[in-house]
Amino acid sequence: MPWGWQEKIASAAAQDRKNFIVFILQSYNNYRNFTIFGNMKRSLILLLMAAIAFDACAPKPVVTRKDNTVDTYFGTEVPDPYRWLEDDSSEETAAWVKAQNKVTDYYLKRLPGREKLLKRLKEVANYEKVGVPFHEKNGKWYIYKNNGLQNQSVLYEMESPEDVPVVFLDPNTLSEDGTVALKGCYFSNDGRYMAYTISRSGSDWEEIYVMDARTKELLPDHIEWAKFTEAAWCGDGFYYSAYDRPGEDHAYSGKNEGHKIYYHKIGTPQSDDVLFFENPAEPLRFYQFTVNEAETMGFLYEDGADIGNNLYVKDLRKADSPFVQITRDMKNACYPVETDGELIYLFTNVDAPMNKLVVTTIGNPKVWKDLIPEWDCVLNGVSFITDGFIIANYSKDASTHAYLYDRHDGRRVEELHLPGVGSASFIAKLGEPWCYYSYSSFTTPGTIYFWNIETGDSIVYKQPKTAFDLSGFETVQVFFPSKDGTRIPMFLTYKKGIKLDGSNPVYLYGYGGFDISLSPSFSSMRVPYLEAGGIYAQVNLRGGGEYGEAWHLAGTKMNKQNVFDDFIGAAEWLIANGYTSSEKLAIVGGSNGGLLVGACMTQRPELYAVAVPQVGVMDMLRYHKFTIGWNWAPDYGTSEDSEEMFRYLLGYSPLHNLKPGTAYPATLVTTADHDDRVVPAHSFKFAATLQECNSGDKPQLIRIDSKAGHGGGKPLAKVLEEQADIYSFIMHNTGM
């Protein structure tokens, strides 16, 4: 039959059932008076019957019940009709989740090319991924490795970095579906034991187990309800941070209050653990205690009330020694990175918005000497190597630059020449002459190098062998003016020889918060999109840490709109310069980046074809009432701070700025049932309101994962399915 009608029908059916039926009816009407098309008419009648049957089988859109809940802020009434969705343990919420997932699954699983895309995602992810080797106190070397499609990376042990690795701890054996993740491992200072933390189903709640590092035997020690913790070894036990056991109904949504530090002695039950520190006067704080390798000093961290932290030191050589405060008022960041005898090396931004390294002593910890002073680039971290040098990791225009410094006088010795514009992280050890680092870029998978301090050369230690070739792609960095004229950087990755005719699909990604920097890094999940002709754009927004504390503060509290203006400016620049058009543009972000996407799609819905807010903070008036949301107040402010702050939050809160009768972009909201960082109620209420307000014909869906959390520790099998859904949704709704 003529004119490619089969392709038109397939496209209409994939878009939505209504379009499918309308297309068949229109086609039949066009041909009904032409007898030469009798066979076509019969075919169309059969297709119409099939379409009606197809429509009857499809799940109906969810109509969410509304109630009359209203909150009053400074005399202003704010309705919250979907408040009941905050109860994640109710049967009604569970039924709503099931109904929404049924609609979403029906749509996603029928997208043209999804299965082909999933197959390609598995192919490009199936290569050996290796971490940076590290040397432990028992003389052994350890390395994380994933053979390709393992759900979780495995910890291996070696006699030397060149030795054949032997499995030391395989988290894939801890669950059948890969949803138990290894979060951290901590060797005792004599090398005899290793404590490790795990999380289940992506939750922030942690459990601690202990194994004999020599025999790999699992000991009976087991700690529950730990959170945001390490295991700080001292003597024959370790310190850890935990909360009281929560109520069963709200373990994943209730406010976390009263963080405490305990000491656990090996071979005893958790019920015998000794309470080491608590502060009932300040329940909305985090506390953590760390111990140096020599077990001569302990450091107490306190944070949560402002953008920085308080730091205290305790001399463990003296019985009942007091905590001595090093920093106060929580206005700045400060933490120890190394100790040597009486010396303490502190990384801080006190009087240094771009960060610096100072040295002090345990005898007089309030007197500091600048060792690596503040520079015009952001100091991201330091690594001590041999007895005399420090590797300083800097960020310049969001990519890594590294320099070697003399530890004794702070003199800059030389630059470490990295393979290109990308990101690098270093592992070295005081007193040892080796340094390994990982390097990646948008087109270079993570590669491990050995850096020779004597020659200054970088030697490849482990380089991945992949099933794809990215030599035909390139990355450029551009700068554009935001609404107020601020110069904003953005990385673009695409096929070489691209035409700037406005026809290219773009995946625009951003974050913009909490002093977190977005640097060039590799993800195999982007490869099929790039291969299909898409452009990956990553923009460095204010609120992040790319240019120091001033850049961060420019995107917080009453300056938060700057972040959204930067992101909107990136979209407008890409369109104005011929990279794409509104019909080809997708915006994506997670967590604080989900807030970003939610705010930008409500402020400029016509600017984008697709929006994917992932695990986003959508209710800016109530976010601080769930789990650890109170900890975000230094960046956001709260609706209870002042009337001015309330009105500012109300002005951009994604949930409260969805307008009835508005045509929104094709939207896929994502969340998960065990997300106790940004509770799923944010996404639930946003999706329900979006579906109510949308007047356009583009899909408004929510994808609610099970046995998953905020993203950390998610098994690869789940990641692949999720990315297949997201990318196929984006590609279909941008015409790829």
Task: List the predicted regions and their residue ranges.
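Residue-level detector of structural "landmarks"
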Residues: 2-6, 15, 21
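Short, Lys/Arg-enriched N-terminal segments with co-localized hydrophobic residues
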Residues: 18-39
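Sec-dependent N-terminal signal peptides
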Residues: 43-51
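Beta-propeller folds
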Residues: 46, 56-413, 417-418, 424, ...
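Glycine-rich His-Gly loop
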Residues: 146, 349, 440, 509-514, ...
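Cap/lid segment of the alpha/beta-hydrolase catalytic domain
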Residues: 172-185, 198-203, 217, 451-457, ...
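Active-site-proximal cap/loop segments of hydrolase catalytic domains
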Residues: 532, 538-736
